[in-house]
Amino acid sequence: MKRSAFFISDGTGITAETLGQSLLAQFENITFNKFTRPYIDSVEKARAMVQQINNAADKDDVRPIIFDTIVNQDIREILATSNGFMIDIFSTFLAPLEQELSSHSSYSVGKSHSIGHNSNYMERIEAVNFALDNDDGARTHYYDKADIILVGVSRCGKTPTCLYMAMQFGIRAANYPLTEDDMERLQLPAALKEHRSKLFGLTIDPDRLTAIRHERKPNSRYSSYAQCEFEVREVESLFRRENIPNINSTHFSVEEISAKVLVEKGVERRFK
């Protein structure tokens, strides 16, 4: 079964998309065609959006799901005329919260991410820069400044996890790819030994690793199942031998991996 889903906002659309994606993920038997539409901030744009929604309804022969964080009442009313099932995120959650707090909300779109009022902005940028500078074992002499160091075979999800932790939580995360040479030495690389307390391992199912590597280097030794199976087996053995906490990333999203890593290592988020 297929359904169209729209994430609509008069701001960046991050809130609508994040919450909407999380909710839709609970319905694994349905395939969603997803469309993010930020900055729908005028009557003209709203009317054009209604046409897009109605076109999707006609094409799918079923009304689309709409997640919106629209602040402007006039624009919301226009969207409500579409042939879609609307979930107004702000009104759904803010109304009961206003009642509980005995206070009216400001209904300010994008407030939680405002640069001008967010003292965490520079820390977020510094964390992202750290993740980029210390990606893939490129530099190891700043590991003393890292909050956490992810280790694992190439293409197991280390880089996106580091960037997510940096962007969302201000975590200074480095990552180091364990190579065939490291595995043959049967011990941690020298650059990692003195930072053992910061290490966390990612592993992955060999068949999934094969598929990922095949997209990068098809029909190569690097992407062969035999090579992937060997590397995964050896790196998991290294994790056990060195007592490095680890998780299998195969069936988890970047968000889930990040949360599990922080909990396992007891690393506090710099901001929430």
Swiss-Prot record:
Recorded coiled-coil stretches: none
Catalysed reactions, semicolon-separated: [pyruvate, water dikinase] + ADP = [pyruvate, water dikinase]-phosphate + AMP + H(+); [pyruvate, water dikinase]-phosphate + phosphate + H(+) = [pyruvate, water dikinase] + diphosphate
EC number per UniProt: 2.7.11.33, 2.7.4.28
Chain sites annotated for binding ADP: G152, V153, S154, R155, C156, G157, K158, T159
Alphabetically ordered keywords of this record: Kinase, Nucleotide-binding, Serine/threonine-protein kinase, Transferase
Class of this enzyme: transferase
Gene Ontology molecular function: ADP binding; ATP binding; phosphotransferase activity, phosphate group as acceptor; protein serine/threonine kinase activity
One Pfam family this sequence matches: Kinase-PPPase
Function according to Swiss-Prot or TrEMBL: Bifunctional serine/threonine kinase and phosphorylase involved in the regulation of the phosphoenolpyruvate synthase (PEPS) by catalyzing its phosphorylation/dephosphorylation.
Family named by the database record: Belongs to the pyruvate, phosphate/water dikinase regulatory protein family. PSRP subfamily.
NCBIfam families: PRK05339.1
HAMAP family: PSRP
Protein name: Putative phosphoenolpyruvate synthase regulatory protein
Organism listed in the record: Pseudomonas savastanoi pv. phaseolicola (strain 1448A / Race 6)
